């Protein structure tokens, strides 16, 4: 059964209220403390959260299905139990979506641009990640990261973000793995065909970094996660560049590609 990642996180919470709701990467290892300076945590008052990517001192990119009330955004976090001197908390001043109704599908427009209530400064643990200048190539090695469950379907929640490498496939691989996908899509298909490594649960909204370049946003995949032959889908950032850049430049009525 294919589920949007944040829905899977809600199910995990219902099954395990005693556990902390967080998100990690299955099959990964603890990220190097300096490799995720752009990675943000997004919480609401219930504690549920997604990931996101700082792309500018005032802007974060995440998934549309991560939209929530009372959003709190944390930057500069590594270990949940250890607060860095430069760790920051921000709120969403404005949120932008491709459609005014905030509709999206598993294969289209699952993207949200967040303007922070005030800018952040670069520091030892905080720095933005540049937007891509070119689309990624099939066969690229891509990096995934997050604070979520490292096991599925039962949840295990570490205190530090985990990172892992996966491969970028032709979109047809995901069409073969997941029923109902259209012939074309503004998404990227990535994973490990033998299984065992994957984003999962609430990893939604976090980055897919291919050959060192920010290329995708964690959107959705199979449940349980990390199953053989079931790569996940990621919103293709490159296709939304004009929309992102227009909004940041002040054209808040900019429209997404059809």
From Swiss-Prot:
It is found in: Secreted. Inhibited by diisopropylfluorophosphate (DFP), but not by SBTI, Antithrombin III/heparin and BPTI, probably due to steric hindrance caused by its huge carbohydrate moietie. Glycans are attached at residues 32, 44, 103, 121, 133, 154, 170, 211, 251, 255. It comes from the Eukaryota. SUPFAM superfamilies: Trypsin-like serine proteases (SSF50494). Thermostable. This is Snake venom serine protease BPA. It is an enzyme of class 3 (hydrolase). N- and O-glycosylated. The glycosylation has a stabilizing effect on the protein. However, the removal of part of the carbohydrates enhances the proteolytic activity of the SVSP towards human and rat fibrinogen. It comes from Bothrops jararaca (Jararaca). The keyword Repressor does not apply. Belongs to the peptidase S1 family. Snake venom subfamily. Its main location: secreted.
């Amino acid at each position: 059964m294919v589920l949007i990642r944040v829905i899977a996180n809600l199910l995990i919470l219902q099954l395990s209220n005693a556990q902390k709701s967080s998100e990690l990467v299955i099959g990964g290892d603890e990220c190097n403390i300096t490799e995720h300076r752009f990675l943000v945590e997004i919480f609401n008052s219930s504690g549920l959260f997604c990931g996101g990517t700082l792309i500018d001192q005032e802007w974060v990119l995440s998934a549309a299905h991560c939209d929530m009330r009372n959003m709190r955004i944390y930057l500069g976090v590594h270990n949940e139990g250890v607060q860095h001197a430069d760790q920051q908390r921000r709120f969403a001043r404005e949120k932008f979506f491709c459609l005014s109704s905030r509709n999206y599908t598993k294969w289209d427009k699952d993207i949200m641009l967040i303007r922070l209530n005030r800018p952040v400064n670069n520091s030892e643990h905080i720095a933005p990640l540049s937007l891509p200048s070119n689309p990624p190539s099939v066969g690229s090695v891509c990096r995934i990261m997050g604070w979520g469950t490292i096991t599925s379907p039962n949840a295990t929640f570490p205190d530090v973000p985990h990172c892992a490498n996966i491969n970028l496939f032709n979109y047809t691989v995901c069409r073969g793995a997941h029923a109902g996908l259209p012939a074309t899509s503004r998404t990227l298909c990535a994973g490990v065909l033998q299984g065992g490594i994957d984003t999962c649960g609430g990893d939604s909204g976090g980055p897919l970094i291919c050959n060192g370049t920010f290329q995708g946003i964690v959107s959705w995949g199979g449940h349980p996660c990390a199953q053989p032959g079931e790569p996940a889908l990621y919103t293709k950032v490159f296709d939304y560049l004009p929309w992102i850049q227009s909004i940041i430049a002040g054209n808040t009525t900019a429209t997404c590609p059809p």
